[in-house]
């Protein structure tokens, strides 16, 4: 498995892969050619090196935050022949009925996802986030630690929900939005909205 990135989130992904007993893990960082090893694992600096050592169609996971960056790097890796893989923690709670999970996800430890939930491609659902029944989350969103999406919430693509934020039932949030940490979203938000506070505005 190739993890894109060598920062804090990449380290958390490494923890999850260790828990899942993934035998061989490598990292990719094309910005720091002096970094040859990350916590005992080889770091590649070019796609050519990855393909020579692994294969033309290498499995990868995005180990960085930020919805727009995750989207760009996911598409870049796919363009090079990479196969997006999901990292799904062994310590999370998934609903039983009509659950749709996209490709290339990071579902971290402590996450709770109810039944009738749809999560698009490339999303990061961070530690202890709680997603209730009927929620719909678009592609490449980031749901930060301890955020709560209540029943039938709809989130567009590449939207960021900050740590500890709460989105009330039935709320619709557009694409490319940013919801500040600890906010309470009480009304629908158009695409490209940036809000914070209680109520969020």
Feature map (PLM): residue ranges:
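Conserved acidic residues
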Residues: 25, 58-59, 103
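Cofactor-binding loop segments of dinucleotide-utilizing enzymes, especially the Rossmann-like FAD-
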Residues: 6, 29-30, 65, 89, ...
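Short alpha-helical
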Residues: 8-9, 68-69, 100, 184
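Hydrophobic, well-ordered beta-alpha structural blocks that scaffold small-molecule cofactor pockets
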Residues: 1-54
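Short amphipathic alpha-helical segments
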Residues: 14-16, 72-76, 119, 191
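Phosphate-bearing ligand-interacting subdomains
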Residues: 34-93
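Structural signal for interior beta-strand "rungs" in well-ordered beta-sheet cores
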Residues: 87-196, 200-201
């Amino acid at each position: 498995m190739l993890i894109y990135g060598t920062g804090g989130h990449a380290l958390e992904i490494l923890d999850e892969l260790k828990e899942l007993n993934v035998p061989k893990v490598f990292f990719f960082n094309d910005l720091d050619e002096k970094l040859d090893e990350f916590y005992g694992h080889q770091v590649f600096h070019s796609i050519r090196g990855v393909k020579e050592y692994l294969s033309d169609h290498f499995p990868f996971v995005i180990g960085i935050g930020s919805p727009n960056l995750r989207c760009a790097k996911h598409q870049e890796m796919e363009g090079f022949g990479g196969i997006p893989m999901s990292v799904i923690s062994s310590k999370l709670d998934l609903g039983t009925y009509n659950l749709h999970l996209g490709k290339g996800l990071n579902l971290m430890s402590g996450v709770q996802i109810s039944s009738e939930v749809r999560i698009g491609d490339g999303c990061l659902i961070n530690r202890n986030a709680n997603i209730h029944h009927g929620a719909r989350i678009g592609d490449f969103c980031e749901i930060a630690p301890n955020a709560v999406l209540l029943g039938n919430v709809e989130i567009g693509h590449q939207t960021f929900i900050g740590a500890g934020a709460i989105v009330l039932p039935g709320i619709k949030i557009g694409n490319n939005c940013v919801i500040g940490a600890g906010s309470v979203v009480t009304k629908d938000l158009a695409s490209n909205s940036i809000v914070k506070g209680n109520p969020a505005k």
